[in-house]
């Protein structure tokens, strides 16, 4: 399901048998309709970014709900898929902050310790937030609580009001929070553009004696 160390730590913040409830939910959802991402990618964020390597969290709300977009990493799409509006704005801010990046697939960020997590890990086709409030929030809140327990610093990048509510779980003074409005077209000009989250993250990591992220890779 997820990287084994993640699995053991997350379980400690969940009611007993919660993983069984998740599996039942997934069985029902994927047999009753079209759901994104593909089932094998539901836990991809936790599979490709081990807990011990995680130094940044970028929290999204739920997967893209269009065909072939969602791949289990927040804001990322496969390389051959056109960038959705929020990702276009993320890449625009990155270009203004550090430099241009042409890739739509953010897997190389994930492989450098950037956990690309959505608060909801599944979505029905064409129905944004269609699985909100059903099963995922206790699980992904537990992920944030696990990160909060880390001894090494983590930079939490929280875009938009929904993500910023999760600050309540970040109580460890070792960690850092970068927050701004969401990169969606509705809010990007209200403070997302010009917020420089990428250079600010690297400045924090380097000050903490850690390696910065190659955001252009």
UniProtKB/Swiss-Prot annotation:
The keyword Thylakoid does not apply. It catalyses: Hydrolyzes single-stranded DNA or mismatched double-stranded DNA and polynucleotides, releasing free uracil. Keywords: Cytoplasm, DNA damage, DNA repair, Hydrolase. One of its GO terms (cellular component) is cytoplasm. InterPro entries: UDG_fam1 (IPR002043), Ura-DNA_Glyclase_AS (IPR018085), Uracil-DNA_glycosylase-like (IPR005122), Uracil-DNA_glycosylase-like_sf (IPR036895). One of its GO terms (biological process) is base-excision repair, AP site formation via deaminated base removal. SMART domains: UDG, UreE_C. The active site is at residue 62. Pfam families: UDG. Its EC number is 3.2.2.27. One of its GO terms (molecular function) is uracil DNA N-glycosylase activity. It comes from the Bacteria. It is found in: Cytoplasm. Excises uracil residues from the DNA which can arise as a result of misincorporation of dUMP residues by DNA polymerase or due to deamination of cytosine. Belongs to the uracil-DNA glycosylase (UDG) superfamily. UNG family. This is Uracil-DNA glycosylase. The lineage of its organism: Bacteria, Bacillati, Bacillota, Bacilli, Lactobacillales.
């Amino acid at each position: 399901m997820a990287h084994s160390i993640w699995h053991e730590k997350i379980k400690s913040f969940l009611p007993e048998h919660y993983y069984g409830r998740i599996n039942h939910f997934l069985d029902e959802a994927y047999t009753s309709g079209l759901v994104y991402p593909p089932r094998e990618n539901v836990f991809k964020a936790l599979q490709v970014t081990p807990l011990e390597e995680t130094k940044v969290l970028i929290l999204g709300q739920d997967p893209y709900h269009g065909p072939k977009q969602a791949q289990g990493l927040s804001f990322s799409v496969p390389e051959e898929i056109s960038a959705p509006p929020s990702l276009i704005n993320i890449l625009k801010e990155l270009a203004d902050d550090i430099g241009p990046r042409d890739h739509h697939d953010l897997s190389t960020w994930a492989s450098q310790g950037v956990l690309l997590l959505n608060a909801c890990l599944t979505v029905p086709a064409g129905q944004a937030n269609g699985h909100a409030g059903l099963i995922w929030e206790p699980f992904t809140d537990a992920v944030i609580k696990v990160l909060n327990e880390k001894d090494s610093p983590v930079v939490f990048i929280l875009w938009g009001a929904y993500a910023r509510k999760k600050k309540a779980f970040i109580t460890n003074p070792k960690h850092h929070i970068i927050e701004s409005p969401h990169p969606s077209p509705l809010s990007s000009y209200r403070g997302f553009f010009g917020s420089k989250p990428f250079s600010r993250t690297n400045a924090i990591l380097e000050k903490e004696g850690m390696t910065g992220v190659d955001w252009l890779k």
